């Protein structure tokens, strides 16, 4: 568990200034990010790992990981240049900017120049997918699996209500193992005008997708 000063700093990181609904932009809470990183460290060990944060947004996940652990490489990738500017400021606030890199890219574009097969672990808080964008969360996971080396891991957050569906679908992928390693709570504040409640408490799963050695 980070010390109180670190927890306070993470809690003060900037979120989206003008979140884009088409990108399903929601800021990950510092509490959720810390819990996620602790569980990942317990599962595979973070020290010396090469990490990629896919769809990093304002950088809560990558900033938390770089603050808590001695990682060899940390790369954040996002399509939104405005979010990446905020992410850059957050990395400076946490004083980890020298150990982190950012890349603007559309990960869903097959022609994007991405460093595939080079990371030990990918972390993702993907879009959950609306009725007009169903399945995008699993597309993010598949991109994550492309980014990690054989034997590497993808850790992704998904609504607990979709657990059976996700694990069932992952079984169809060759060379991939999947398990739910934690159920967590995400206190999601109202982000868009159509949100009626000030906050919603969502049950989310941290799913571990393992890219098996070939």
From Swiss-Prot:
Keywords for this protein: Methyltransferase, S-adenosyl-L-methionine, Transferase
Enzyme class: transferase
Residues that bind S-adenosyl-L-methionine: 25, 28, 55, 58, 78, 106-107
Task performed by this protein: Catalytic subunit of a heterodimer with TRMT112/C04H5.1, which specifically methylates the 6th position of adenine in position 1717 of 18S rRNA.
Catalyzed reactions: adenosine in rRNA + S-adenosyl-L-methionine = N(6)-methyladenosine in rRNA + S-adenosyl-L-homocysteine + H(+)
Phenotype of null mutants: Worms are viable and do not display obvious developmental defects; they however exhibit significantly longer lifespan and heat resistance. Cells show reduced N6-methylation of adenine(1717) in 18S rRNA.
CDD domains: AdoMet_MTases
Recorded superkingdom: Eukaryota
Protein's name in the database: rRNA N(6)-adenosine-methyltransferase metl-5
Quaternary structure (record): Heterodimer; heterodimerizes with TRMT112/C04H5.1.
Enzyme Commission no: 2.1.1.-
SUPFAM superfamilies xref list: S-adenosyl-L-methionine-dependent methyltransferases
Pfam short name (any one): MTS
Similarity comment text for this entry: Belongs to the methyltransferase superfamily. PrmA family.
UniProt keyword S-adenosyl-L-methionine present: yes
GO biological process terms held by the UniProt record: positive regulation of translation in response to stress; rRNA base methylation; rRNA methylation
Single GO MF descriptor: nucleic acid binding
């Amino acid at each position: 568990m980070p010390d109180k000063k670190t927890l306070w700093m993470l809690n003060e990181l900037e979120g989206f200034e003008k979140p884009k609904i088409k990108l399903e932009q929601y800021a990950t809470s510092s509490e959720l990010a810390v819990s996620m990183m602790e569980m990942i460290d317990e599962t595979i060990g973070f020290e010396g790992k090469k990490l990629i944060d896919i769809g990093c947004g304002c950088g809560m996940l990558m900033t938390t990981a770089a603050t808590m652990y001695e990682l060899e490489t940390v790369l954040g990738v996002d399509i939104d240049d405005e979010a990446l500017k905020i992410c850059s400021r957050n990395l400076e606030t946490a004083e980890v900017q020298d150990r982190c890199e950012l890349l603007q890219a559309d990960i869903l574009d097959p022609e994007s120049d991405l460093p595939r097969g080079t990371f030990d672990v990918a972390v993702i808080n993907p879009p959950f997918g609306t009725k007009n964008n169903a399945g995008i969360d699993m597309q993010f996971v598949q991109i994550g699996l492309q980014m990690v080396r054989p034997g590497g891991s993808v850790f992704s957050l998904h609504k607990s209500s979709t657990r059976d569906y996700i694990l069932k679908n992952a079984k169809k992928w060759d060379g991939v193992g999947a398990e739910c390693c934690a159920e967590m709570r995400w206190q999601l504040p109202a982000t868009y005008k159509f949100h009626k409640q000030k906050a919603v408490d969502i049950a989310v799963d941290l799913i571990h997708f393992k890219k098996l050695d070939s």
